Amino acid sequence: MQYIDDAEFQVAIDPDAGGRIISLKWREMEFTVPFRGQVHTYGWYPMAPWAGRIADGLITSPTTGVHQLPTNIDPPNALHGFGLSSSWQVVGPGHLLLHLPAPYKGATVEQRYEVLDDAIRWSIEYDANGCDLPVWLGQHPWFARDLDRGGSAEIEFNPGKMMKRDEKLPTGELILPTAQPWDDAFTEVRGTPAVIWEDVARIDIESDAPWWVVYSEDPEGVCIEPQTAPPDAANLGMVGEHYVEALYVFSEACFHFQDSENINN
């Protein structure tokens, strides 16, 4: 376990639990969803070498053909990559390295967590090392819906387009955003996404990521996920960058003036 204790932040990172943040406290308030029995429903974890679902867990290399990925988390689809269920090597404080298994064998992923005065900087980088399989990356923070004080979490999120979804998988068609709840991919996001606990705190998520997935269907947590491409990107003929970074800026929230559901209605 790694611990970073810096001024107003206390962060616990578990390299053996997907290299994820399992606890993040700011001003003594816990902002992460704790372990609930499933590997994909707690903490803040990396999604690599793919983010979201891949239909039937099938990924295609231009040189070695079709490969079957694990589908045990969300059958029949592959979900969120190898990173969340792997043990990561500790390189330094907040710096972790993962050597990927087959069929991505030879490739690596590095992630860094850096605690600043009022923010957490989180980056994930993929190095192919000759592997030609499709890759796209993402960050999956689970924000606790309720803190020990103040209002429940609300999402401030203003997307221009939403990818239409068929069951659990995006179709590739862009549509106008619907109202919440969401388990959907978005692009052309205006402004800075945020999670707000009225009268207590807000977290603004600053990232150049071209895609975002928002999950607001869980009673205990909400997720705003910067990604380099949408779920099932390879099957949609899309590619993603091999680097994603976001700055999670913490501040007091004295009032709440607008939310995405009001924006889209």
Where are the predicted features?
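Beta-strand-rich N-terminal accessory domains
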Residues: M1-G65, R190-A209, Y243-E261
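Hydrophobic residues embedded in beta-strands of well-ordered beta-sheets
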Residues: Q2, H95-L96, I120-W122, P193-A194, ...
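Extended, loop-rich substrate-binding clefts of extracytoplasmic carbohydrate-active enzymes
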Residues: Y3, P70-D117
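Acidic, contiguous internal or C-terminal segments within carbohydrate-active enzymes
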Residues: P15, L98-L147
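Active-site scaffold segments
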Residues: G57-P62, H140-W142, G221-Q227
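Active-site/ligand-binding surface loops and adjacent short beta/alpha elements
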Residues: L133-P134, W142-D208
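Glycine-rich active-site loops that engage anionic ligands at enzyme catalytic sites
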Residues: W197-P231, G237
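C-terminal structured interaction module
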Residues: C223-N265
